[in-house]
A protein has these predicted regions:
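Acidic/aromatic/glycine-rich contiguous surface patches that form carbohydrate-binding/processing clefts
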Residues: 103, 157, 163-232
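Noncatalytic linker/hinge segments flanking ATPase motor cores
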Residues: 80-87, 135-143, 224-231
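Generic signal for short, ordered secondary-structure residues
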Residues: 14, 21, 153-154, 181
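A broadly tuned preference for mixed-charge, low-complexity surface segments
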Residues: 77, 97-101, 150-154, 228-232
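Hydrophobic, secondary-structure "cap" segments at the distal end of domains
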Residues: 121-180
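Substrate-binding surface in catalytic domains of secreted glycosidases
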Residues: 1-133
Length: 232
């Protein structure tokens, strides 16, 4: 990429990044130190910690582990970031990924409890866009120990794990406290607008969005904005 860049009229720095796992069964077999020499930053996929594949209902994007209810937190973001840092990755190169969707569990008495089925969703079974949450009849709750949010409908015995504005704000403060490089999401079309926007909440805490100039050069594109290099 650097060699190619040197042949261009304007030599760009092309960024090389990776979407990296937050589960130890995956990150422990990676040559993180070797990869870090070439990567500009690491996008940590800090979500999908729990889901339809599990035996009990759990948090899908918690910051910390729950000692009192370990079944609810099979993974946690704090431990994942700690591992990458110990492998030599600078905190500023780690970008915290956050979900703009929730994972559902049906017929369950709560976190760490068995469930049966995940039900329907916004675009696949058991997965709801954040903008559709909380579901009618559900109340939003916060897990102090795991540092995670979710909603629960006791009448339907239906639980959905997802980030709320409170959780987004807490994660943004955690990013600042630990000197991380920023935040990213999967994916923006599922966000709410206004004060309930998770992206907007995080940006409000961090201060701004990424504003690096685009390095797209495609003068023959049929799209005017591409021909102009996405200059706005």
């Amino acid at each position: 990429m650097d060699t190619y860049s040197s042949t261009l009229p304007v030599p760009y720095h092309f960024e090389l990044t990776v979407a990296c796992p937050a589960g130890p069964q995956n990150y422990k077999i990676m040559d993180i130190a070797g990869m870090d020499k070439y990567l500009d930053f690491w996008n940590l996929m800090a979500y999908d910690y729990s889901g339809s594949w599990d035996q009990v209902a759990g948090h899908q994007a918690n910051l910390k582990a729950s000692k009192g209810n370990s079944g609810a937190t099979p993974f946690n973001t704090e431990k994942a970031v700690e591992h990458y840092r110990k492998q030599g990755v600078a905190a500023l190169k780690i970008v915290l990924g956050m979900p703009l969707y929730g994972r559902a569990f049906e017929n369950t008495d709560g976190l760490g409890k068995p469930f049966s089925g995940v039900g329907e969703g916004s675009w696949e079974n058991g997965v709801f866009d954040y903008k559709a949450l909380p579901l009618p009849g559900a109340e939003e709750r916060y897990d102090e120990e795991a540092r995670a949010s979710y909603s629960y409908d006791p009448a339907r015995r239906h639980l959905v794990t997802y980030d709320t504005p409170r959780m987004a704000r807490e994660k943004a403060e955690w990013i600042k406290k630990n000197g991380l490089g920023g935040a990213m999401w999967w994916e923006s079309s599922a966000d709410k607008v206004g004060e309930q926007s998770l992206v907007g909440t995080v940006v409000g805490v961090l201060g701004s969005m990424e504003s690096t100039m685009n390095c797209v050069e495609y003068p023959h594109s049929k799209f005017e904005n591409v021909r102009k290099g996405f200059k706005g």
